[in-house]
Amino acid sequence: MPKIKTNRGAAKRFKKTGTGKIKRSHAFTSHILTSKTRKRKRQLRSSAVVAAVDHKNIAKLIPYM
């Protein structure tokens, strides 16, 4: 049986942690930053964990990570 292809867009956006969770970055950080507060921009820099409801679908996109 052939290997499953990794979705290259997903591979650039997500990373797996040591415990198997999937990390993601926040949106709304690329432009129109003057209207956002310093606190909001600082919090958006940190990474987040993918919600449990989305985990299964994203894991299918990155099978070998």
From Swiss-Prot:
InterPro entries: Ribosomal_bL35, Ribosomal_bL35-like, Ribosomal_bL35_CS, Ribosomal_bL35_sf. Residues 1-45 are annotated as: Disordered. The keyword Transmembrane helix does not apply. It comes from the Bacteria. Belongs to the bacterial ribosomal protein bL35 family. PANTHER family: 54S RIBOSOMAL PROTEIN BL35M, LARGE RIBOSOMAL SUBUNIT PROTEIN BL35M. NCBIfam families: rpmI_bact. This is Large ribosomal subunit protein bL35. It comes from Geobacter sulfurreducens (strain ATCC 51573 / DSM 12127 / PCA).
